[in-house]
């Protein structure tokens, strides 16, 4: 394993200082509302020195950090004449360059094969990973935390005299939510994910006919995501406070699987002719799963994540939704024939016959043939002078049909 650090790479910063004089002239205390008063004059009134009141805020420095990176792996590899195995455990912990942002991952990988005799082979490979992210989630545009460091003017302090986060204390002062405020709001939000995929196979080689190989493989992928986000009550300068907080909890899972069976026959005739024929079937199903989301408001202890459950919110305003994932199924038959003469003259012919739930009901099945011819010119005698610098040169021409599956099953008709 190893540990390192990732510092921010944004070395060129916009210098937003030196504007406090214009700010002083633009704002005076009208006495109508304490939260609308100029922070500069408020600080003077509260006993701060003129230098302290003029200091301003470097929003960029207030939200960045040097992120530590840890990456550790343990592997075990072994085997014998009839079996092999490998197992790997991994742990990753990466802090972001924005405070309170991070990425964690726990992973497991296994790979095993078993050969009880010269005809039969079976095996599996599995990858599992549990991940968690927190803090800044990569928002776009002005909503991004980095963007807020240069859309809020530097003469705006982090807090007003009442201890609340400042925002747009003036029409041209910047965003209503500062970068520091957003970092604080993201502190306890998280998203957790699970990714798992596995493939198992069995293979027979030369069971009855020399050159025949039978193979069956089943693979599956399971993905899950859970997230928890609290939108706190907000008290900001020059902006009406929000009356309620909101907890949003989201979860979904999705399963895809694929089953492929092939029979492959290879034959060499008189050392010059090589033939390979593949016949197979394939079944695919995607989108087995479900999505759910629930929201509630009015949490008494919004800063304590131990109380963040939907049951602890107000029952007077409940939001929820759920849906099944879109399912897509496909079944196909396919064949392929490859021929080569002395490795120089090549021909390939393929045919697929597929049925899909994305096809219209009147055209459930489709046929998709293709053919290609190739010539490996580098093996010709007239190419011998070029072999010192050009060892493989091949021309290939082909024609075929393919299918574009629509992005949504609802578009099939």
What is each stretch, according to the model?
Residues 55-60, 92-95, 178-187, 240-248, ...:
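Extracytoplasmic loops and strand-loop junctions of Gram-negative outer membrane beta-barrel proteins
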Residues 4-7, 82-95, 99-160, 187-226, ...:
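Transmembrane beta-barrel strand/turn architecture of Gram-negative outer membrane proteins
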Residues 357-359:
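Extracytoplasmic/secreted cell-surface and envelope-processing proteins
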Residues 346-355:
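Catalytic-site beta-strand/loop segments enriched in glycine and acidic/polar residues
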Residues 1-6, 10, 406-413:
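Single conserved hydrophobic/aromatic residue that forms the stacking wall/gate
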Residues 4-99, 137-140, 183-190, 203:
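Residues embedded in well-ordered regular secondary structure
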Residues 45-77, 81, 232, 241-344, ...:
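Outer-membrane beta-barrel transmembrane domain signature of Gram-negative proteins
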Residues 17-54, 143-182, 233-246, 289-320, ...:
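Surface-exposed loop/turn segments flanking beta-strands in extracellular/periplasmic regions
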């Amino acid at each position: 394993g190893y540990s390192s650090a990732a510092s921010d790479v944004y070395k060129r910063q916009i210098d937003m200082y030196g504007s406090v004089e214009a700010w002083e002239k633009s704002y005076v205390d009208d006495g109508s509302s304490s939260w609308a008063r100029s922070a500069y004059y408020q600080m003077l009134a509260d006993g701060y020195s003129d230098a302290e009141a003029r200091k301003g805020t470097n929003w960029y420095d207030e939200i960045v950090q040097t992120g530590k990176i840890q990456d550790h792996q343990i592997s075990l590899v072994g085997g014998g004449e009839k079996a092999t195995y490998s197992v790997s455990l991994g742990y990753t912990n990466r802090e972001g360059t924005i405070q309170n942002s991070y990425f964690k991952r726990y992973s497991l990988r296994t790979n095993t094969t078993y050969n009880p005799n010269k005809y039969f082979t079976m095996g599996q490979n599995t990858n599992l990973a549990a991940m968690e992210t927190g803090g800044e989630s990569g928002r776009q545009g002005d909503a991004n935390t980095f963007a807020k460091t240069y859309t809020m003017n530097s003469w705006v302090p982090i807090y007003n005299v009442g201890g609340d986060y400042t925002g747009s204390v003036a029409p041209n002062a910047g965003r209503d939510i500062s970068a520091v405020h957003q970092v604080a709001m993201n502190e306890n939000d998280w998203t957790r994910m699970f990714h798992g995929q596995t493939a198992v196979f069995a293979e027979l080689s030369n069971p009855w006919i020399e050159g025949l190989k039978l193979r069956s493989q089943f693979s599956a992928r399971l993905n899950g995501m859970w997230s928890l986000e609290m939108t706190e009550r907000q008290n900001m300068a020059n902006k009406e406070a929000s009356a309620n907080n909101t907890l949003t909890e989201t979860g979904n899972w999705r399963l895809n699987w694929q089953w492929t069976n092939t029979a492959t026959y290879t034959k060499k005739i008189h050392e010059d002719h090589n033939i390979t024929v593949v016949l197979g079937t394939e079944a695919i199903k995607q989108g087995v799963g479900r999505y759910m989301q629930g929201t509630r408001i009015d949490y008494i202890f919004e800063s304590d994540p131990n109380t963040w459950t939907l049951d602890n919110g107000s029952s007077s305003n409940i939001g929820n939704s759920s849906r099944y994932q879109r399912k897509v199924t496909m079944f196909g038959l396919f064949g392929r024939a490859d021929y080569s003469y002395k490795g120089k003259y090549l021909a390939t012919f393929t045919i697929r016959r597929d049925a899909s739930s994305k096809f219209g009901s009147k055209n459930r099945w489709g046929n998709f043939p293709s053919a290609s011819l190739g010539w490996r010119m580098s093996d010709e005698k007239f190419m011998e002078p070029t072999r010192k610098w050009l060892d493989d040169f091949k021309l290939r021409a082909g024609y075929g049909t393919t299918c574009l599956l629509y992005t949504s099953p609802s578009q099939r008709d």
